[in-house]
Amino acid sequence: MSDNSQKKVIVGMSGGVDSSVSAYLLKEQGYQVVGLFMKNWEEDDDTEYCSASADLADAQAVCDKLGIELHTINFAAEYWDNVFEHFLSEYKAGRTPNPDILCNKEIKFKAFLEYAAEDLGADYIATGHYVRRRDIDGKSQLLRGVDNNKDQSYFLYTLSHQQIAQSLFPVGEMEKPEVRKIAEKLDLATAKKKDSTGICFIGERKFTDFLSRYLPAKPGPIVTVDGETIGEHQGLMYHTLGQRKGLGIGGTKEGSEDPWYVVDKDVANNILIVAQGHEHPRLMSVGLIAQQLHWVAREPITEAFRCTVKTRYRQADIPCTVTPLDEDKIEVRFDYPVAAVTPGQSAVFYQDEVCLGGGIIETRIQE
């Protein structure tokens, strides 16, 4: 076994069970382990939305129990400039961004990685992500986590092989119940804490309430694919393709009780377009165009190849053919039609267990 005692690892302690167990596992492997708690969001009200102080207290309790020190760092300014402003501008343009992917790219594996290496003298950083790393021919590949239910490689496709080489993912080799069991055995403060859901800076609060603070709502008509106005939306930004809940419309006068789904957004005219049935042709795509490409451990593609793709987190892999259009744009053709392919979201590509990389969905291709 290699001697890790000279290697210093800074663990991103979120106050959750995964990072807690990651710190423990690394300590068991002999590394010098130090915790770092990142504050990425400044609350502007006194409500209970943000649990940052509770998370910090949990992280501190875990570090005390494990006998490691905990540093704190405030990245709120970097987060606002590099993640949140982009998030707002995408919503304004009628797209649906994924801020967690940008947060990993700009904060956790950039600002945090740089701070850990330069200010804290780290050899590695570690996080509680459910992914694995494999080193081949001097390059680090990103692999799916062993726990298929929890695999988070979708959120990390923007990392370079250099960033992956400086990162450790201790729980990536484990199933989630196993991780909880370790935390319970050690009696860690986070052992029974539920997994955080939703976007990091919104927490558990209602998305529409949060967004309306930053972007003025602009109501407009809800129109069927046949051109009939059947309701009013409170703002296109509150809706995403494939959405069913929160439309406030019942069956049609013809009597069909099939639920309504958002099938398109006409941003120029502020119209929300809906249809009945989750397999309506307007909801289905046969492919997509992606841009802002990033390949983890391979050169940019020059010819078509076969792989699988996910167009959203926790979706089953879709077999597809990827064809380069130019240096930063590809066409992806699915083997079968796929519902709710959403511009602004990420398309992430896989070859078996290896995450190849991905890009931002620019447009969807329909029959």
Curated annotation (Swiss-Prot):
Residues 150-152, 312-313 are annotated as: Interaction with tRNA. Keywords: ATP-binding, Cytoplasm, Disulfide bond, Nucleotide-binding, RNA-binding, Transferase, tRNA processing, tRNA-binding. It comes from the Bacteria. The active site is at C103 (nucleophile), C200 (cysteine persulfide intermediate). It holds the Pfam family tRNA_Me_trans. Its main location: cytoplasm. GO terms for biological process: tRNA wobble position uridine thiolation. GO terms for molecular function: ATP binding; tRNA binding; tRNA-uridine 2-sulfurtransferase activity. ATP binds at G12, M13, S14, G15, G16, V17, D18, S19, M38, G128. Interacts with TusE. NCBIfam families: PRK00143.1 (NF001138), trmU (TIGR00420). This is tRNA-specific 2-thiouridylase MnmA.
